[in-house]
Swiss-Prot record:
One GO cellular component term: cytoplasm
Family, as annotated: Belongs to the tRNA-modifying YgfZ family.
Lineage, highest ranks first: Bacteria, Pseudomonadati, Pseudomonadota, Gammaproteobacteria, Enterobacterales
Organism of this sequence: Escherichia coli (strain SE11)
PANTHER family: TRANSFERASE CAF17, MITOCHONDRIAL-RELATED
Protein name: tRNA-modifying protein YgfZ
Gene symbol of the encoding locus: ygfZ
Length: 326
């Protein structure tokens, strides 16, 4: 029997989040194992996986030949290969693309639904987990493994942990934390990723953007020194010829409805409104605020005003916790 997702509650911004345990049911795990795993992934993703240590996780992109992302992957070493976490809506097509050249290599690429993905965030998240594991990951050591469990550490928007584990441990954690922690589903983790400026690629936006249009270069997800990988030429051209004119932005404000992934927004131009951008993800918080992650031109004025199409309410730009200056 699969681990049952927790019932949803309205998500909360990181600054006010009580201790919360989340099921990450909208995310999914996949793995590559076998003697050629590292070499194979090195030829497929934007990050330099050969330089990754056991204690690192990276956000990398898997692109098509034109440099457009099938998906982005939260990648870490796992067993004799690698595991990655991506949006569940893109896992199957992403794995289909990744397997295309695998027949020539000693690798096995597969979805992993045996393990459970949990998130822990909010007030004193570290203290709550310290009683349950002998070591927790940190800035210096961002991945820690203990038994069947892998713990990933995230700094933004506030310290939080992603736990990859077996069902028995997931049940144990739920039992131990149930009293002190709120339980929530993956919408809360999504809200934190939006706040952190981590790009969310769902099926509607797969194959649409080069990595730099979603700030991946600012998140350490692209190596410009490594050897060939699928889409490299276009990704390099965007950097060295200044071909990328887009960036990922965080908007906040109000809206009478949540915009969907793939939808555009409207930008105020004097008395008029002009369509702009592509929404990657949006969430309504418990205080009524709407947060939207959107890809738009990278030269937007900081005081620009936006709205969901034809809406009476407005959205404004919020700062991201990282710089886009190279």
């Amino acid at each position: 029997m699969a681990f049952t997702p927790f019932p949803p509650r309205q998500p909360t911004a990181s600054a006010r989040l009580p201790l919360t345990l989340m099921t990450l049911d909208d995310w999914a795990l996949a793995t590559i194992t076998g003697a050629d795993s590292e070499k194979y992934m090195q030829g497929q993703v934007t990050a330099d996986v050969s330089q990754m240590t056991e204690n690192q996780h990276l956000l990398a992109a898997h692109c098509d030949a034109k440099g457009k992302m099938w998906s982005n992957l939260r990648l870490f070493r796992d067993g004799d290969g690698f595991a990655w976490i991506e949006r569940r809506s893109v896992r199957e097509p992403q794995l289909t693309e990744l397997k295309k050249y695998a027949v020539f290599s000693k690798v096995t690429i597969a979805p992993d639904d045996e393990r459970v993905l949990l998130g822990v965030a909010g007030f004193q998240a570290r203290a709550a987990l310290a009683n349950l594991f002998s070591e927790l990951p940190s800035k210096e050591k961002q991945v820690v493994k203990e038994g069947a469990t892998t713990l990933l550490w995230f700094e933004h928007p506030a310290e939080r942990f992603l736990i990859v584990t077996d069902e028995a441990t997931a049940n144990m954690l739920t039992d131990k934390l149930r009293g002190e922690a709120e339980l929530n589903n993956s919408q809360q983790w999504l809200a934190l990723n939006i706040e952190a400026g981590f790009p969310v690629i769902d099926a509607a936006n797969s194959g649409q953007f080069i990595p730099q249009a979603t700030n991946l270069q600012a998140l350490g997800g692209i190596s410009f020194k490594k050897g060939c990988y699928t889409g490299q030429e276009m990704v390099a051209r965007a950097k060295f010829r200044g071909a990328n004119k887009r960036a990922l932005w965080l908007l906040a404000g109000s809206a009478s409805r949540l915009p969907e992934a793939g939808e555009d927004l409207e930008l105020k131009m004097g008395e008029n409104w002009r369509r702009t951008g592509t929404v990657l993800a949006a969430v309504k918080l418990e205080d009524g605020q709407v947060v939207v992650q959107v890809v738009m031109n990278n030269d937007m004025e900081p005081d620009s005003i936006f709205r969901v199409r034809d809406d009476a309410n407005t959205l404004h730009i919020e700062p991201l916790p990282y710089s886009l200056e190279e």
